[in-house]
Amino acid sequence: MNYFITFFFMHIAVLNFYFRFSNGNKIVMRVGGSPETKRLERSKRQALRMDNEPRWPRGTINYFFDEQRFDENSRATVLRAMEKISNHTCIKFSPKDARIKLRIVSDKGCQAAIGRVGGDQQYLSFPTSCYSVGSASELIHVIGFLHSHQRADRDEYLKLNLQPWRLNDWFQTMQYKKYLDQWWIVPYDYGSIMQYHDSDNEYGPKNSKYFRTMGSQIPSYFDYLMINEYYQCSCEGEEQINCKNRGYPNPGNCSECNCPLESSEEWKNITLNLDAGYMSLQNGTKLHQIDFVFRYLSISAPANKTIEVDIREITGVECNYGCYIGGIEVKTHEDRRMTSPRLCCKNDNEIYKSRNNPTIVMAFNSEGLDKYNIFYRFTD
């Protein structure tokens, strides 16, 4: 039996692990406790390492906007990114004066040092070209993490075809192998906000279904988890908190859980209408919203059935790398914490098959009105 569903809307959204990469030397970055920690159950993880102690003291980053060099059109974007990180981790951003501060300017390019690098002030460059909640990636650099394509295990997931000029760019091409004997935190997630898109045909995914997923502007479940493990964030008495879907108590609010799925309600034969509208800058320019709006569909099937999802109509959705304006994701990955392939281009559509029961469909948008016509059925 086919069920027909129509989605009207606009978009936003969210996550981690543990493995040791050893290449023979002394530099060790212990992250978030022992290898037996409950949150870390698989074999591959994301690492970080740039200095002997790149963490910010007590997980607090005091900051200020340089009024002479900062573009006020970007203030709300930076503050929203700070809020999202603090809401899911124990990292706190404080405008209070302190001896060690993050100085935020709007110079050319989105630029950030990796972790706490020393001195009384540290720079974060955030011009309007970095506009959107994707600015969280720059703040995650500040917290202590590099890009996904700089992981030591990148060759297992990416097909590199670097341009000649890029080969001389040590920072873009270096791998963590340089730092040797590291502790890894999270598995490789194509949907991480730290993963570049492949617009220059340099970092192609070995799993081609993730081509549009790469370059996401949405912090993933594992993005937040790696921060929490690295800074050893936890909640007192967290064993008493019952988190579903392999979630864990949220250090940003210990009465809640950080879960890979935002919704568990069952929806059938329903129409969703949601308009994200536009953001107006001080000069009158209209842009997409800073953050995304989300809508979720939960599809439950009889026992031992496969759920097939066919997205037959897509209107109002912009086809681009990372689906950074909006798109839709059918959670087909067997590990529900991982990002599944995303869709924002009409020609990329396929029938998605899932053994997850329920299967969650996540739609996200940051500009205007989007529409999806969705069919689903159950098969043996």
Curated annotation (Swiss-Prot):
Tree of life domain: Eukaryota
Annotated Gene Ontology cellular component terms: extracellular region
Localization annotation: Secreted
InterPro entries in the cross-refs: Astacin-like_dom, MetalloPept_cat_dom_sf, Metallopeptidase_nem, Peptidase_M12A, Peptidase_Metallo
Domain Peptidase M12A: 46-234
Glycosylation sites: N87, N253, N269, N283, N304
Bridged cysteine pairs (disulfide): C90-C233, C110-C130
UniProt xrefs under SUPFAM superfamilies: Metalloproteases ('zincins'), catalytic domain
Active site, UniProt feature: E138
Entry's Gene Ontology molecular function annotations: metalloendopeptidase activity; zinc ion binding
Keyword Transferase part of the UniProt annotation: no
Keywords: Disulfide bond, Glycoprotein, Secreted, Signal
Keyword Isomerase (UniProt): no
PROSITE patterns membership: ASTACIN
One biological process term in Gene Ontology: proteolysis
Record's signal peptide: 1-24
Pfam families: Astacin (PF01400)
PANTHER family named among the record's database cross-references: DISCOIDIN, CUB, EGF, LAMININ , AND ZINC METALLOPROTEASE DOMAIN CONTAINING (PTHR10127), ZINC METALLOPROTEINASE NAS-22-RELATED (PTHR10127:SF794)
Function text: May lack metalloprotease activity.
Stated name of the protein: Zinc metalloproteinase-like protein nas-21
Organism, as annotated: Caenorhabditis elegans
Name of the gene encoding the protein in the UniProt record: nas-21
